[in-house]
Curated annotation (Swiss-Prot):
Cellular component terms per the entry's GO annotation: extracellular region
Role: Regulatory subunit of the blood coagulation factor X-activating enzyme. Activates coagulation factor X (F10) by cleaving the Arg-Ile bond at position 234, activates coagulation factor IX (F9) by cleaving the Arg-Val bond at position 226 and is also able to activate protein C (PROC). May serve as an exosite by which the enzyme recognizes and binds to the Gla domain of factor X (F10) in a calcium-dependent manner.
Signal peptide: 1-23
Localization per record: Secreted
Official protein name in the record: Snaclec coagulation factor X-activating enzyme light chain 1
C-type lectin domain segment(s): 34-145
PROSITE patterns: C_TYPE_LECTIN_1 (PS00615), C_TYPE_LECTIN_2 (PS50041)
SMART domains in the record: CLECT
Note, other: Calcium is required for ligand binding.
Organism: Macrovipera lebetinus (Levantine viper)
Assembly with partners or alone: Heterotrimer; disulfide-linked. The heterotrimer consists of 1 heavy chain (a metalloproteinase) and 2 light chains: LC1 and LC2.
Molecular functions (GO terms): metal ion binding; toxin activity
Tissue-wise expression: Expressed by the venom gland.
Length: 146
């Protein structure tokens, strides 16, 4: 009896070590999981607005990818560089000037429409780590996350 319990306990330990913490995150088969979120890079080229809409149609709670750490950015860059034809993809920061409140050094409000006619959104470059701005109407790949 003692040997049975010992073997059973040993098998339980092996099972738990192979299965991780028990908090694994299940993603659809064509999505990749990282830190309890699911990601997918699409080769479709879309402007920022259409890319965000596209992501929301892919899965419940899905949006353009948001990046909350350097490690997450590394993961996304690696995923994108393996999947995408071109090295740029939209991230979930769009129309940067829309909600910004800024003022000149003399206290006057900045009128962004005088600065640029087009809105600027952010994308990630898979060849160079970091975010870049580009007009939201340009085309780039799509990376979704939920």
């Amino acid at each position: 009896m003692g040997r049975f319990i010992s073997v059973s306990f040993g098998l339980l330990v092996v099972f738990l070590s192979l299965s991780g913490t028990g908090a694994d995150f299940d993603c659809p088969s064509d999505w990749v999981s990282y830190d309890q979120h699911c990601y997918k890079a699409f080769n479709d080229l879309k402007n920022w607005t259409d890319a965000e809409k596209f992501c929301t149609e892919q899965n419940k709670g899905s949006h353009l990818v948001s990046l909350h750490s350097s490690e997450e950015e590394d993961f996304v860059v690696n995923l994108a560089s393996q999947s995408l034809q071109y090295p740029v993809a939209w991230i979930g920061l769009g129309n940067m000037w829309k909600e910004c409140r800024s003022e000149w050094s003399d206290g006057g409000n900045v009128k962004y429409k005088a600065l640029a006619e087009e809105s600027y959104c952010l994308l990630i470059n898979t060849h160079k780590k970091g975010w870049r701005s580009m007009t939201c109407n340009n085309m780039a790949h799509v990376i979704c996350k939920f």
